[in-house]
C-alpha cells in the first residue's frame, strides 16, 4: 500500500463562478489560476501522483505550458490516473477536505463525489469529500481564497 498527500490553494480574483471537485458553483468571485482553478481536483491529483511516486501536478502539467491554460481539471485527473494505472496501481480510497469560508460546499459534495468516482473508475464508497472552515482565521477565513487537502491510498494490482 502507498499513501499520497496533496495540497492546493487558489486566491479569489475576477468574477465567478468557481469550479470545485468538477462542479460549477455559483459565486460572485472567481479563482485565479492557470487552469480552471479546481483546488479539490488539483490536491487530489497531487495525492494520487505522490502515492505513485510520479511527482506532482506541476511536473505533469506545468503552468508555464500554454497548452494547459484554462485546462479542465477533470481531464488532468483522468490523464494522471491513466499514468498511475500504467504503473500497476489500483485505488484503495481517496479523502478530500475543502477549506473555505464561502461559498458553502455541502450542497455540491454529492456531485463532486460522483465526478471523482467517474474519473477514477471507482465506486462512490471509495471517494469521500468534506468541507470545513477555519472559523474566519487565516486567508481562507478572511475570504481571500480556497484551500484543499487530499489523501489517496493506492495498492499494487494483483498480477
UniProtKB/Swiss-Prot annotation:
Keywords: Isoprene biosynthesis, Lyase, Metal-binding. Disulfide bonds: none annotated. 4-CDP-2-C-methyl-D-erythritol 2-phosphate binds at residues 8-10, 34-35, 56-58, 61-65, 100-106, 132-135, 139, 142. The keyword Zinc does not apply. It is an enzyme of class 4 (lyase). Pfam families: YgbB. Pathway: Isoprenoid biosynthesis; isopentenyl diphosphate biosynthesis via DXP pathway; isopentenyl diphosphate from 1-deoxy-D-xylulose 5-phosphate: step 4/6. It comes from the Bacteria. GO terms for molecular function: 2-C-methyl-D-erythritol 2,4-cyclodiphosphate synthase activity; metal ion binding. Binds 1 divalent metal cation per subunit. The record marks 34, 133 as: Transition state stabilizer. It catalyses: 4-CDP-2-C-methyl-D-erythritol 2-phosphate = 2-C-methyl-D-erythritol 2,4-cyclic diphosphate + CMP. One of its GO terms (biological process) is terpenoid biosynthetic process. Its cofactor is a divalent metal cation. A divalent metal cation binds at residues 8, 10, 42. Its EC number is 4.6.1.12. Belongs to the IspF family. Involved in the biosynthesis of isopentenyl diphosphate (IPP) and dimethylallyl diphosphate (DMAPP), two major building blocks of isoprenoid compounds. Catalyzes the conversion of 4-diphosphocytidyl-2-C-methyl-D-erythritol 2-phosphate (CDP-ME2P) to 2-C-methyl-D-erythritol 2,4-cyclodiphosphate (ME-CPP) with a corresponding release of cytidine 5-monophosphate (CMP). Homotrimer. This is 2-C-methyl-D-erythritol 2,4-cyclodiphosphate synthase. The lineage of its organism: Bacteria, Pseudomonadati, Pseudomonadota, Gammaproteobacteria, Enterobacterales. The gene is ispF.
Amino acid at each position: 500500500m502507498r499513501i499520497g498527500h496533496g495540497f492546493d490553494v487558489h486566491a479569489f480574483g475576477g468574477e465567478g463562478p468557481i469550479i470545485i471537485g468538477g462542479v460549477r458553483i455559483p459565486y460572485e468571485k472567481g479563482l485565479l489560476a492557470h487552469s480552471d482553478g479546481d483546488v479539490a481536483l488539483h490536491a487530489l491529483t497531487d495525492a494520487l501522483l505522490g502515492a505513485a511516486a510520479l511527482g506532482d501536478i506541476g511536473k505533469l502539467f506545468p503552468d508555464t505550458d500554454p497548452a494547459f491554460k484554462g485546462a479542465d481539471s477533470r481531464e488532468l485527473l483522468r490523464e494522471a490516473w491513466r499514468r498511475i494505472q500504467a504503473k500497476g496501481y489500483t485505488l484503495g480510497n481517496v479523502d478530500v477536505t475543502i477549506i473555505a469560508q464561502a461559498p458553502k460546499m455541502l450542497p455540491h459534495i454529492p456531485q463532486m463525489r460522483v465526478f471523482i468516482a467517474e474519473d477514477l473508475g471507482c465506486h462512490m464508497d471509495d471517494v469521500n469529500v468534506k468541507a470545513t472552515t477555519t472559523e474566519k482565521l487565516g486567508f481562507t477565513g478572511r475570504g481571500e481564497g480556497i484551500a484543499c487537502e487530499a489523501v489517496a491510498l493506492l495498492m499494487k494490482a494483483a498480477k
